[in-house]
C-alpha cells in the first residue's frame, strides 16, 4: 500500500538517519535531512571504511534482526550496484561458554560450529587458545561502511531528498505535525520527524520530555599489519572475544576485530577514551589505548603483525541496557538512538524499519522489543 506523500524532516545523517531518509524519499515522500556536519562526518558515529556485521548474537531477537539486515544489505547492493558487505566468518569466544549463542543460532536455523579451545587457530591464524570453547559462524564479515553510506546518499539524492548542514536545537510536536528548530534559520515544519542524531539525542530528548539515561562516549580502533602489504589479512576471519578474567585475575575487556580490505586488520577493545560531551570535537587517538590494543594483538592474535598502521576515534551512545531504542513518540516523532556500538551492522535494515515507523506502520514483535516501554519501570 502506497501512502500519501508526507513532509519528513530527518535529524542525523549517519548510519541510521541517512538510510531512513533515502528509503522515505524513495517511497515518494518530501524529505529534508539535517546534520550539522553532513553524512558520516568525522565527528559522528559513522565515519571510517568498515564495521562488523554478524549473525552471532546471544539472543534470538538480534539473530533474526541480523538475518533481516543481511537481506537489507543485499537489497541495497542490488539497487545500487555497490558491494557493501563481505563474508569472512566470525569466531566468538565467551567466558560464559557457547551456550546462549549456540541456542540462539540453532533456534533460528543458522549453521555454526562449536569449536574446541585448542582448535581456535584453525579459524583465525595465530589465535592463542585458552580454556574457553568458541563458536564459529560463516555469517559474518566487514560492512564496507563508507561505500554503504555513499550508496545510501546516492539513493537519497536521486529520489529528490534535500540535505541541509545545520545544527538542530530542538524538536516540537505541534498541531498537525512537528516543528524542528534549526540554528540560525527559520524552523522546519513537517508531518513527521525522524530522529537518529547519535550522541545528539541526549539534548533533543530532554526537550521532548523523554527521560532516558544515554551515555555518549568515544572509542578507538587500530589497524594492524605490514605497511608494505596491508592487504595481507584481507581474507582473515572476524573475531569477538568477550570480557573474561586472565590467569592473573585481571579483567580483560571485550575485543572485536575484522579485516579492512587493503588497510589492515582492525581491532578495538571496549574501553572508552572518555565520555563525550557537547562541544568535544577532539578525535585524536590515544597513544595509551593504541599501546594497550597492540599488546593484546601481540599476545592473543599472533597471526597479525602487531604493528599499528593507523588509529581512529568515533562515538558510541550507550543505552541503559545496551540495546537499541526504536519507538514512535506522540506528535509525529520517530526516535532511533542508543546504538550501543552495534548500529552499523543494522544500518541498511534501519532504513526500512524507521521508514515504516514514520509511515505509521505497526512494528513487528522483534522491532517492538526495542521500544521505550521496556524502561517504564526502570
Predicted ranges, named:
Residues 11, 187-200, 351:
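Short hydrophobic core segments
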Residues 93-160, 164-165, 170-175:
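Flavin (FAD/FMN) cofactor-binding and adjacent substrate-gating region
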Residues 170-188:
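Conserved beta-strand-loop-beta-strand element in the redox core of flavoprotein oxidoreductases
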Residues 3-16:
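Beta1/beta-strand and adjacent pyrophosphate-binding region of the FAD-binding site
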Residues 22-26, 82-85, 199-331:
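Active-site substrate-recognition segment that forms the wall
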Residues 49-123, 131-132, 254-255:
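Dinucleotide-binding Rossmann-like beta1-alpha1 core, especially the glycine-rich loop
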Residues 299-378:
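C-terminal catalytic lobe of FAD-dependent flavoproteins
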Amino acid at each position: 500500500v502506497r501512502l500519501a506523500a508526507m513532509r519528513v524532516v530527518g535529524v542525523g545523517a549517519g548510519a541510521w538517519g541517512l538510510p531512513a531518509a533515502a528509503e522515505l524519499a524513495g517511497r515518494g515522500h518530501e524529505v529534508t535531512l539535517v546534520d550539522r556536519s553532513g553524512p558520516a562526518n568525522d565527528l559522528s558515529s559513522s565515519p571510517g571504511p568498515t564495521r562488523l556485521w554478524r549473525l552471532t548474537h546471544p539472543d534470538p531477537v538480534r539473530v533474526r534482526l541480523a538475518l533481516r539486515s543481511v537481506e537489507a544489505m543485499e537489497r541495497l547492493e542490488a539497487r545500487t550496484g555497490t558491494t557493501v558487505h563481505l563474508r569472512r566468518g566470525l569466531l566468538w569466544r565467551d567466558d560464559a561458554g557457547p551456550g546462549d549463542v549456540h541456542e540462539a543460532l540453532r533456534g533460528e536455523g543458522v549453521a555454526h560450529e562449536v569449536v574446541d579451545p585448542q582448535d581456535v587457530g584453525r579459524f583465525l591464524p595465530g589465535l592463542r587458545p585458552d580454556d574457553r570453547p568458541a563458536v564459529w559462524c560463516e555469517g559474518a564479515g566487514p560492512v564496507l561502511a563508507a561505500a554503504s553510506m555513499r550508496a545510501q546518499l546516492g539513493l537519497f539524492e536521486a529520489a529528490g531528498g534535500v540535505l541541509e548542514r545545520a545544527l538542530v536545537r530542538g524538536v516540537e510536536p505541534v498541531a498537525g505535525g512537528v516543528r524542528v528548530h534549526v540554528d540560525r534559520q527559520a524552523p522546519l515544519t513537517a508531518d513527521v520527524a525522524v530522529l537518529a542524531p547519535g550522541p545528539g539525542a541526549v539534548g533533543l530528548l530532554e526537550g521532548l520530555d523523554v527521560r532516558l539515561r544515554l551515555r555518549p562516549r568515544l572509542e578507538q580502533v587500530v589497524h594492524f599489519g605490514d605497511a608494505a602489504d596491508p592487504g595481507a589479512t584481507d581474507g582473515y576471519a572476524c573475531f569477538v572475544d568477550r570480557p573474561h578474567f586472565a590467569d592473573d585475575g585481571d579483567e580483560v575487556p571485550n575485543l572485536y576485530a575484522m579485516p579492512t580490505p587493503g588497510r589492515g586488520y582492525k581491532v578495538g577493545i571496549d574501553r572508552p577514551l572518555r565520555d563525550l560531551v557537547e562541544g568535544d570535537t577532539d578525535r585524536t587517538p590515544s597513544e595509551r589505548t593504541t599501546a594497550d590494543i597492540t599488546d593484546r594483538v601481540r599476545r592473543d592474535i599472533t597471526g597479525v603483525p602487531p604493528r599499528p598502521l593507523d588509529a581512529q576515534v568515533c562515538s558510541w551512545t550507550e543505552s541503559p541496557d545496551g540495546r537499541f531504542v526504536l519507538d514512535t513518540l506522540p506528535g509525529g516523532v520517530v526516535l532511533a538512538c542508543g546504538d550501543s556500538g552495534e548500529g552499523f551492522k543494522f544500518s541498511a535494515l534501519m532504513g526500512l524499519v524507521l521508514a515504516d515507523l514514520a509511515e505509521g506502520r505497526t512494528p513487528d514483535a522483534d522491532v517492538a522489543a526495542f521500544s521505550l516501554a521496556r524502561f517504564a519501570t526502570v
